[in-house]
Amino acid sequence: MLIIKNGTLLPMTCESLNADIMIDGGKIAAIEKDLSSENAEVIDASGCFVTPGLIDSHSHIGLMQTGSPERDHNELSDPIAPELRAIDAINPFDCAFAAARSSGVTTCITGPGSINLIGGAFAAVKTTGYVVDDMILRNPAAIKMALGENPKLRYSEQNRSPRSRMAEASIIRKALVRAIEYRNAIEWSEKTNGKLPARDLAMEALLPVLSRELPLKIHVHRADDIATAVRVADEFDVRYTLDHCTEGYLVTELLKKALVKNCQGIIIGPLISYSGKYETAKKIDFKMPLALYEKGIPFAICSDYYENPVELLRVCAALSAAEGLPSYEALKAITINAARITGISDRVGSLCAGKDADIAIFSGDPMDCRSRCLITIIDGNIVYKRSHLT
């Protein structure tokens, strides 16, 4: 049992709170003033800020090893590969997980890259553990889809389709139609006691998307690709997030309409790269969060690790605040907004009794880049403690 005392809480249910947190059995047991227990270890957070553990809403952590040429995030054998599963490639010993813990990041949504049009299943994982199966918060968390430069350029190099944006959308539509036909064949065989169709792992992986149990996680940068993503998703009435959404500030009315229908959120980032990427030429960097906020569009900020180091997630939010985004909104983008958009807010994203005890303690305002992460707690266990707390 742990009790965190004397800190300034930023619970994400209100802007700030002066109270203690009791942790028991890996969960937040209580948030009240003057908590005590004979059996509890006490953490004195005087002068510190206490937040929910930070959430990286789009990452490839564990699939791209820091400092290594190994890359397990893209499979170039087929542009339609929804059956791929991130958990089969995540390396818990990737040193980026330690970097995440040292910066207060407790959950990452990690998965396949953007080479394939439909690239496989993302997973929400905690950033501590030795076996990925023990780190899972939600699996699968989403199915990756990608539009734009990456799929057509990579497959053009192999003299294969897609070679154009038209082909990208067409191939995705065909895959979703195949999945519908596969579902219909299963339902018909069950209804008539007939023979089941041969098992198809790719189509099977898309069934939860068609039933709206799982969202598509759609990689998009250009405004026209954003429009195509919305168009195709609405044609098949599937849920989705728009990830990166680099030119989203140019089509805010489209985004607002999409959020009313099937889009469950916008995930922006990385905010510190892509300087040489043609389709991100209109990138507005740290002004992007403010542009969406001013239009009333909720969003999360991601690192897109390996593109940005995961330990810079908080820095990206803080630099967005420096561009005029209210600090509280910046923190929401890497806590509760990230949790809501990725479908894990029942477990993480805010400091509430009953939620997972994933907590970060900072030396000062977390939206001040000079503040340091002092302690990180995951599932009630201290997984990082700064050696010099001053």
Kindly give the residue locations of the regions a language model identified.
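Polyanionic/metal-chelating signatures
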Residues: 101-240
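Active-site core of metal-dependent hydrolases
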Residues: 86, 183-285, 300, 340-342, ...
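Histidine-rich, glycine-flanked metal-binding segment
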Residues: 9-52
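Active-site gating loops and adjacent loop-to-helix segments of metal-dependent hydrolytic enzymes
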Residues: 67-90, 131, 142-158, 195-196, ...
